[in-house]
Amino acid sequence: MKLTKGCAYKYIIFTVLILANILYDNKKRCMIKKNLRISSCGIISRLLKSNSNYNSFNKNYNFTSAISELQFSNFWNLDILQKDIFSNIHNNKNKPQSYIIHKRLMSEKGDNNNNNHQNNNGNDNKKRLGSVVNNEENTCSDKRMKPFEEGHGITQVDKMNNNSDHLQQNGVMNLNSNNVENNNNNNSVVVKKNEPKIHYRKDYKPSGFIINNVTLNINIHDNETIVRSVLDMDISKHNVGEDLVFDGVGLKINEISINNKKLVEGEEYTYDNEFLTIFSKFVPKSKFAFSSEVIIHPETNYALTGLYKSKNIIVSQCEATGFRRITFFIDRPDMMAKYDVTVTADKEKYPVLLSNGDKVNEFEIPGGRHGARFNDPHLKPCYLFAVVAGDLKHLSATYITKYTKKKVELYVFSEEKYVSKLQWALECLKKSMAFDEDYFGLEYDLSRLNLVAVSDFNVGAMENKGLNIFNANSLLASKKNSIDFSYARILTVVGHEYFHNYTGNRVTLRDWFQLTLKEGLTVHRENLFSEEMTKTVTTRLSHVDLLRSVQFLEDSSPLSHPIRPESYVSMENFYTTTVYDKGSEVMRMYLTILGEEYYKKGFDIYIKKNDGNTATCEDFNYAMEQAYKMKKADNSANLNQYLLWFSQSGTPHVSFKYNYDAEKKQYSIHVNQYTKPDENQKEKKPLFIPISVGLINPENGKEMISQTTLELTKESDTFVFNNIAVKPIPSLFRGFSAPVYIEDNLTDEERILLLKYDSDAFVRYNSCTNIYMKQILMNYNEFLKAKNEKLESFNLTPVNAQFIDAIKYLLEDPHADAGFKSYIVSLPQDRYIINFVSNLDTDVLADTKEYIYKQIGDKLNDVYYKMFKSLEAKADDLTYFNDESHVDFDQMNMRTLRNTLLSLLSKAQYPNILNEIIEHSKSPYPSNWLTSLSVSAYFDKYFELYDKTYKLSKDDELLLQEWLKTVSRSDRKDIYEILKKLENEVLKDSKNPNDIRAVYLPFTNNLRRFHDISGKGYKLIAEVITKTDKFNPMVATQLCEPFKLWNKLDTKRQELMLNEMNTMLQEPNISNNLKEYLLRLTNKL
């Protein structure tokens, strides 16, 4: 048989690989015996070299294609070669020919020199040995997710999977810098395909293993922490004989054993610094005990996930993937177990030891050490595990549950110097417990509940079972050293974490795709609680304002996704305002549709059916559907369509048309819904949208019907009201009954009437917003036209005089909420405005806003000043100044209104207002004297107040952070010099997330300065992001928030922002968190 040159070449390669197989070292589980490894590599290299001179062959035939075409993996059974060579050949067809096999053979030489399993960047790209390849029955699919196929047409990055998005404990995970290439022709980033690990909701499979009980011993020392774990395990019904794979990142192994038999690395298991794989033939077929002892380093863990050190406190943060940085575990939310935890540490340094559940006992250890044992009788996923050790002081109280009269001990902990700031948190906890009992009928289920404040925390708080851990700014407050907003924040965050005890803990998630089931639902519960506790209309308006200015922007950006995403790379990147805030509105709509009585029935069904188990969004919808059937008295009624809210991205636009038949006294409302298609969802379906409406008599402003809720389930529908005596004004989406854009098609006169007389605060607020938006868009286009045409003089449409009179009417209304008045004198937030303007010129928008404020101020500044002075006595009353258990939210709203008015008057340079600013700076309330610093930016007293307020703030870290925010948002031309001053004199080398966010994020809201046409604002923030990414990827990604609006800006600014994002993507050690976020944001993933 005559062979072609190409065919001959294939069989030469085949012969070399046969040799490799013969020399395979079974004992060491190594591909080729070490003494022939270099020789084999030399054969390959010489063959490649000779081939490079083979002129008739080298241009037309690809070495890797030759091997690929042989398709050895179809008939070769040797698992090591199949996975480590042949699968890599298929995945690397386009790489240099010497790269593939040479790299795989030579890399093991270096690996053998590093057997201690400490953090090793060289391990990042290693394949896992001894595991099933492409087995569709693989039940450990959470860590073996397949990359996208090229046919999907989606760009991908290297090793971006669910587990590799954090730093290793001594540095940044080293990603292959070759993943991102610069294309000089269009300054874009080209990302090679077939590299990230994409996790899909549709690929969920139960684990092949069960963990029943977890016994942990955590021994804390100065330079290391030793963690010994015993897992009581079993084989699940889904097991198909696969390897036992544990998640474990950056762990140094002391010992691995099963049923007290030590396992041998390489022969019975492998560890690649990310996954511990125990080969299936060494896994027992029934119940067994898996034990491990590892060493970790919380003292150098600056990523603040897993176990880390905040000042002198050892603390954990395990959601979503932190537990794997403490010990080996099958780290997924449906792996629920009972925990028995013992913590030991130096008694002088760490006198307080805490973990989940009830404390069983405490004990002394020779050598000045001590320990405590904790038992949590409730099943929980590992992300709810927590441990704290430190020199902490506390306040405590006893709570008696409503139904069972059980005594619960409540403790709130902090550093000693901040104990006096714990009282409000303790009050909020008691209020939360009572609310959950009264509204939902849910009692606390342990005998003790601990809340702990720590200074270094990536997010707001964490709901760990029985041991809630808080960012200090979400637990500590005093009237002397905290801004007013701190009290509302603590109320909501303490409530949120407590409410998770049922919605998140006792009923947890089947998988991370269901995140909104615990977060959206719990935010909804938190909102109900805070609205009830504050009794102010502005509490609900603040939630609406957040959604419409932040989440709506995300929904129209390249980051748009449903509240339940269908795929993710890094789970931490999906803790978004969509999942949380839009998710909470989706959960709230059930209440709107069902009414309180039937909503509670549905909620009760959900808890009883799923208590102690995992759940999905379908489970919650099923429970609400049962209540819907009850309400409708119709067993055929269903909420199947409602599930589209969980799967469809984007914000619906709902528009209205009206018809009144005077003869029939019949009023018709025609409604249409439309959601814009996007790149991920080309087709959008009609949603189930509840529309709470009222009808207002235009002659006297009174209600003509009782409020009712319309159910829009089609693209268009018409709703008819009978016996309507006069043509009414519709009051639409009362209480913001659905998260949609409302196109009401009302006249300004009708909106003004609603603003003045409607009984619903949201409708009044929205009517005001719509009038503002009409004026903004009109004036913006006039300014833009003048700029583009270089006109020296031009006419601008004045603000409607009737609207200004309506604002005056409401300001002078003694019954109107002071916080509501703050909203109506303020233009909509920039991030809300941006949703209505394409190719935004930020300078033009700034000019537009200044013009409108001046138009209104010229007529109302005297009214503003009069109100500013008249409210002073009540707003700054000191009767309860020293009583931290008494908080008056109405009084706080008065201070908010006064500070808003002072800002408007300062911008307008109102006569003698500087004297008022100086006097205001003497107030004992921090919100007041920080406002005086902020508004002094318009005067030459700024640096005088800068120094004065710094001295007032510097000894309290949380108050200093509020001061930093105030300085950062200063509306001054020299803000860049001021930020540099903050960096050098205050921030310095701080790695504290609160400090970093405080210095930079407020600045990004400055229309003129951050969006300076030179691009220096974008460059500054990009440099901060890159620097932060080296030690804390999660915070680095949070700092990307201002880049979300890049595609809304004008062409020049789009280009500048895109250039900075591309520069960040080219960083050689960019984290997976940041890489995925930027790739999605720039439409590359």
Curated annotation (Swiss-Prot):
**Top-level class of the enzyme under EC nomenclature:** hydrolase
Question: Which residues lie within the region annotated Sufficient for targeting to the food vacuole?
Answer: 1-200
The highest taxon in the source lineage is Eukaryota
Q: Alphabetically, which GO biological process terms does the record hold?
A: proteolysis
Give the activity regulation note.
Inhibited by 1,10-phenanthroline, EDTA and bestatin. Inhibited by (Benzyl)Tyr-Ala (BTA). Activity is not affected by phosphoramidin, PMSF, leupeptin, iodoacetamide or pepstatin.
Claim: Mitochondrion is one of the keywords in the record: no
- Which residues carry the site feature described as Cleavage? N795, L796
Which residues constitute the catalytic centre? Answer: E497 (proton acceptor)
Q: Which residues form the signal peptide?
A: 1-30
Q: Where would you find this protein in the cell?
A: Cytoplasm
Where is region (Disordered) located?
108-130
Q: What is its main location?
A: cytoplasm
Which positions in this protein are listed as binding Zn(2+)? H496, H500, E519
A Gene Ontology cellular component where this protein is annotated is: nucleus
GO molecular function terms listed in the Swiss-Prot or TrEMBL record: aminopeptidase activity; dipeptidase activity; metalloaminopeptidase activity; zinc ion binding
- State which Enzyme Commission number(s) the record gives: 3.4.11.-
- What is the pH dependence described in this protein's record? Optimum pH is 7-7.5. Active from pH 5 to 9. Has less than 20% of normal activity at pH 6.0.
Cofactor, free-text remark: Binds 1 zinc ion per subunit. Also, can use Mn(2+), Mg(2+) and Co(2+) with less efficiency.
Q: What is the effect of changing V459P?
A: Severely affects substrate specificity. No effect on Zn(2+) binding
- Site (Important for substrate specificity) found at V459
* Additional record remark: May have an additional translation initiation. Translation initiation at the first Met codon would generate a form that contains the signal peptide, enters the endomembrane system, and ultimately reaches the food vacuole. Initiation of translation at an internal Met codon would result in a form that lacks the signal peptide, thereby re-directing the protein to the cytosol. A nuclear localization signal would then lead to nuclear import.
According to its UniProt record, which protein family does this protein belong to?
Answer: Belongs to the peptidase M1 family.
Q: What is this protein called?
A: Aminopeptidase N
Recorded source organism is: Plasmodium falciparum (isolate 3D7)
Which lineage ranks, top first, belong to the organism behind this chain?
Eukaryota, Sar, Alveolata, Apicomplexa, Aconoidasida
Q: Which gene encodes it?
A: M1AAP
